[in-house]
Regions:
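N-terminal redox-cofactor-binding region of secreted/periplasmic oxidoreductases
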Residues: 1-193
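N-terminal low-complexity segments that are often proline-rich with Ser/Thr-Pro
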Residues: 195-197
């Protein structure tokens, strides 16, 4: 299996009992480059074939004939190494639709325990939807930006509510990005699968 988000987590889970070994093969290189550990560095990875498979969509009517970049990580840690350190579980409704289409075990309620198991969410928000002891540290920004606040106030004036935890009970609304960052002394360190698993 590859050493992306799913591969590293699955290898960790399969080998956790100590009876099994798992070989993880990654087509990309090591995750040593400094731009992988700088939040804004992800912008350079989006155009760098050393870190990104450079996939693109096909032109379609829905995109008015445009080709849309679809970045995928080509490095240890996979796309978790090139995602700007952002974290988003996805919409509850998407998982529920998969279950309704016959993929039993894939509803949001079915997978919520697994989300909670791998994360350690550092926040004062409601913890009933969040994990606290997992390997991947998820944190909120510890600062506010005047421009971002004005943007969110504008969205709120249009009826889009502020949501302090879009990975919690409700995914709708506007929020600061949650990030996969660990506090390390006076600096911060990317938390991604090759580090955490």
């Amino acid at each position: 299996m590859g050493a992306g988000s799913a591969g590293c987590i699955l290898a960790n889970r399969l080998s956790a009992c100590g009876k099994h070994s798992v070989l993880v093969l990654e087509a990309g290189g090591r995750d040593w480059h400094p731009i992988l550990y700088i939040p804004a560095g992800f912008m350079k990875t989006l155009v760098n074939p050393n870190f990104n498979w450079m996939y693109e969509s096909s032109p379609s009517e829905g995109t008015n004939g445009r080709i849309i970049p679809a970045p995928r990580g080509k490095v240890l840690g996979g796309s978790s190494s090139i995602n700007g350190m952002g974290f988003n579980r996805g919409q509850k409704m998407d998982f529920d639709v998969w279950a309704q289409m016959g993929n039993s075990g894939w509803s949001y309620d079915d997978i919520l325990p697994y989300f909670k198991r791998f994360e350690s969410y550092v926040s004062k928000e409601d913890q009933s939807y969040r994990g606290a002891t997992g390997e991947v540290t998820i944190s909120d920004l510890n600062w506010n930006d005047t421009l971002c606040e004005a943007f969110m106030d504008g969205a709120e004036s249009l009826g889009i509510k502020k949501n302090p935890d879009y990975n919690g009970a409700d995914q709708e609304g506007i929020s600061y990005l949650q990030r996969t960052v660990k506090a390390v002394s006076y600096t911060h360190l990317r938390a991604h699968e090759t580090v955490d698993y």
